Amino acid sequence: LIRRSWFYSSAITLALTSCIVFSATAQQKREVGEPEAATGYIEKKAFVAEDYMVVAANPYASWTGKNIIEKGGSAIDAAVAIQSMLSLVEPQSSGIGGGAFILYWDNKNKVLHTFDGREMAPSAVDGHWFMDGNKPMKWLEAVVGGKSVGVPGAVKALELAHKQFGKLPWNTLFDDTIETAEKGFKVSPRLAKLVALDYHPGLKTFPSSSTYFYPAGMPLKEGTIKKNKALAKTLTGIAEHGADYLHTGELAEKIVKAVNTASINPGKMTLEDLANYTPKERDPVCGVYRDKSICGMAPPSSGGINVFQLLKMLEGQPLSTMKPDSVAFANVYSQASALTYADREKFIADTDFTKLPYAAMINTAYLARRAESIDADKPWRKAKAGNPYGDAEIAMGTSMELPNTSHFSIVDKEGNAVSMTTSIEFMFGSGIMVGGFLLNNQLTDFSFSPTKNRFPVPNRVEPGKRPRSAMSPTMVFDDKGDLEVVIGSPGGSRIISYVAQTLIGIIDFGLDIQQAINLPKMTNRNDYTALEKGTPIADLEAPLTKLDHTVKVVDLNSGLHGIQFKSGKLIGGADPRREGVAVGQ
């Protein structure tokens, strides 16, 4: 059994001594679509280990994963513990009230498994769920309250994975978080700053959330020792009774009541919706870039498809001769990215409802045709979606997918690995808190309008459907089939770009994973070219404008966490834009 007092004292000491200090002048204004504001940047160096490694978004989470592996646990065991801890210490980003995508590498049998724990639409919704008459609701009006809450899936997916690949008993995996919730954790700078922004319209409205995040009417302060006994009780129930404790019984009744009686935007969730949720195992999406196999999640995640598309369309470009902050690289990267996002918006949705075979979108010949227009000297143009499906009558939809998410990467002592991206969507989700955790607002990842020009939008709202996601947990394998990289990021729909750019840094520019994560970020979602503020890449604004780019210099708050196998060592990388740390041995 885990010695809970040892963990608590170690974790609290780490948090008290190694919390990141952010600039007091950190920009607090948000770009449209970036509500989880940037909270600063601190340079990080690669962490090297030999036996195992954990990289997560908060020191408490990294150390509980390390603790589990030291007790003989597997990568999946560590993932269960990390997710429970993130629910406590990083509640704005993910939690047991949300969903997740999990990649698991079984090193002994050399098999990659994927688990879909994406949230699901309740049975009572319809295609007009977010329509206000003939017009779609404004996104910020739709996000708050019960209407946006999807049936959670993260715990169910972890339970399914644990039944297959866990080593330690399920009921031992929550001990660290339960103890920390009972005794208190140190509120991090990032959590305190995000609460202080006072941006979420519902966080002060719902009593349970308001009481927790605004004690005595004031926002949580950095350094406060915060307890969450309600979450400790919930996790004790999950530890003893499994995921059904969340999906059936008294807690399920509380969730349904909170959703359906919300004072803002009440929803229509049923006990049957919660009880009937089923996580799914899906085939991974894999393709070869250079001599590497790039593998990710299948739909409803667009990550596996789109990360590979973006990379493959750049394969004909001499990227290794370019500099990461050069005009040439920024121009070709933006062109490939625009082509990728055009396809994403038109074609990708939950394939249990949209029967378009995604293999056509990663077909080598199709991507070669798409890439013919990419040229380092060519002015940028808004891209049109391709035509991988012939004459299928499909309308291009839009959805607002926001960057409130968390990612962690794990390699255990046996070489098994986890890449898991987990989310409640918006900063603090729907704003509704039940049982000490926040409920997601993932239904706003659907396209609000069900049709466009009389044609159906693939990512429209439907009962039992899972909304499209850009979450991109990714693994990279060499030409012999050996695992080389485990990576992923938060960042809303920009996740695809963050992961692809980092992989280019490793594969084409020859950087280690920390150097690649540190690279100044740029994105183009077929709208404008975003350059990371305060970095050398921002100097490209003028030359890219001359190439007809619409350029915005903004904060780009990725949260990449990854592990690289190199020369017999494990190299861990944690994003300097967030609070994550790499630990191991």
How would you label these PLM feature ranges?
Residues 9-21:
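Bacterial N-terminal signal peptides
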Residues 27-63, 67, 75-76, 80-242, ...:
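Noncatalytic scaffold domains of N-terminal-nucleophile
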Residues 31-32, 316-423, 575:
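Internal maturation/activation junctions in enzymes
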Residues 88-95, 99-113, 265-270, 416-480, ...:
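Active-site rim segments in enzyme catalytic domains, especially the processed small/beta chain
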Residues 280-281, 402-405, 469-471:
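Short, small/polar residue-rich loop motifs at catalytic or cofactor-binding pockets
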Residues 295-304, 405-409, 419-431, 468, ...:
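Glycine-rich phosphate/pyrophosphate-binding beta-alpha loops
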Residues 464-466, 499, 508-555:
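Extended C-terminal subregions enriched in glycine
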